[in-house]
Amino acid sequence: MIKIDTSEIDKFVIDLKDTSENIRSDVQKVLKKSGFNIGARAKGNITNNGSVKTGHLRRGITTDIGNMEVTVHTSNIKYARGVEEGTRPHTIRAKNKKALYWKDAKHPVKSVRHPGSKAKPFLIPAFEKEKEVIMKDLEKIVKW
């Protein structure tokens, strides 16, 4: 009869499992920190690139922390994409009324031609700046 002692293998598996949980926890910390950094940078970019009129877009930037993921987004702000990417020329029509009217307009109109707007990116540049920091922090965790 041959008896094999597996106690060392069992210890190794337990250590590996503990290490895996520690790595997972460290990665989550890096993602959380970077998510909040990206959100803060994006808010700063909005202020710096002249996109602020009411502050609604800046206040709408939120960071959601999940399990091994972080999402930085603009919550329920329909025009955020237009600010980030710009818009093509388009026609604006009255939806709920018969005509459009604004202060200093000579008379109401059924539609107006908008020339489009240049992109004023705020979210992508914030991510691009933080990307290198994320990668360096993750490399430190993996190199144990």
What are these regions (language model features)?
Residues M1-K78, R93-W144:
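Short, Lys/Arg-rich flexible segments
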Residues Y79-E85:
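Short, cysteine-centered beta-strand-loop-beta hairpins and adjacent loop/turn segments enriched
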Residues P89-H90:
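Short, His- and charge-rich active-site/binding loops that engage polyanionic ligands
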